[in-house]
């Protein structure tokens, strides 16, 4: 038996891959690596810092923290127009619900038999009577009342995202 040397010794099963096809998996791996890297970065941002670093920003100088907001006041009673214009932006007169809560916390009902606070009434002359925490408008209010300025503090969207993930994972 003679061997034939005239042709290839084997037949390929599939045609050779083109160079363009060989690069597609490399691009896919780079994309997957970028996604995994971004996920690891977000996970590190969520898990590594303590919860206290994701809290609300502190109140400005001269303001007191009150729940999720900041308050400042002057104990001198003023007229409504002066009270409305006396709060520096972004602050406004304290909202009615926050004023009732502040009155209950400071127990001003026990200390005073009369007195009023101006509250935010969206342009309407609105006040809160301290003795019983009843709010009213116009004639219900006295001419002079105490101005309490208030501005809310709220965390940004990413902070809410981080705290919700930490809560879901049961992290302190």
Swiss-Prot record:
**Locations listed in the record:** Virion membrane
Q: Which UniProt keywords apply?
A: Membrane, Signal-anchor, Transmembrane, Transmembrane helix, Viral envelope protein, Virion
Q: Which domain of life is it from?
A: Viruses
Principal localization reads virion
A GO cellular component annotation in the UniProt record: virion membrane
For this UniProt entry, which segments traverse the membrane?
A: 28-48
How does this chain sit within the bilayer? Single-pass type II membrane protein
Which InterPro entries does the UniProt record give? Herpes_UL45
Q: Which residues lie on this side of the membrane: Virion surface?
A: 49-172
- Pfam families named among the record's database cross-references: UL45 (PF05473)
Intravirion compartment: which residues?
1-27
Record's family? Belongs to the herpesviridae HHV-1 UL45 family.
Q: What does this protein do?
A: Important virulence factor of HSV neurotropism. Seems to be required for glycoprotein B-induced fusion. Dispensable for growth in vitro.
Q: Tell me the protein's name.
A: Envelope protein UL45
Q: Which organism is it from?
A: Human herpesvirus 2 (strain 333) (HHV-2)
């Amino acid at each position: 038996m003679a061997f034939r040397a005239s042709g290839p010794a084997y037949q390929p099963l599939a045609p050779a891959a083109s160079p363009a096809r060989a690069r597609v998996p490399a691009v896919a791996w780079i994309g997957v690596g970028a996604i995994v890297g971004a996920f690891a970065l977000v996970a590190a941002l969520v898990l590594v810092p303590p919860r206290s670093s994701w809290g609300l920003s502190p109140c400005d100088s001269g303001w007191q923290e009150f729940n999720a907001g900041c308050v400042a006041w002057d104990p001198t009673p003023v007229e409504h127009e002066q009270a409305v214009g006396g709060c520096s932006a972004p602050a406004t007169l304290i909202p009615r619900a926050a004023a009732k809560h502040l009155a209950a916390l400071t127990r001003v009902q026990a200390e005073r038999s009369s007195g009023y606070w101006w509250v935010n009434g969206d342009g309407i002359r609105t006040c809160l009577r301290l003795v019983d925490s009843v709010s009213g408008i116009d004639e219900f209010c006295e001419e002079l009342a105490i101005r309490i300025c208030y501005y809310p503090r709220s965390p940004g969207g990413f902070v809410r995202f981080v705290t919700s993930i930490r809560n879901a994972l049961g992290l302190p």
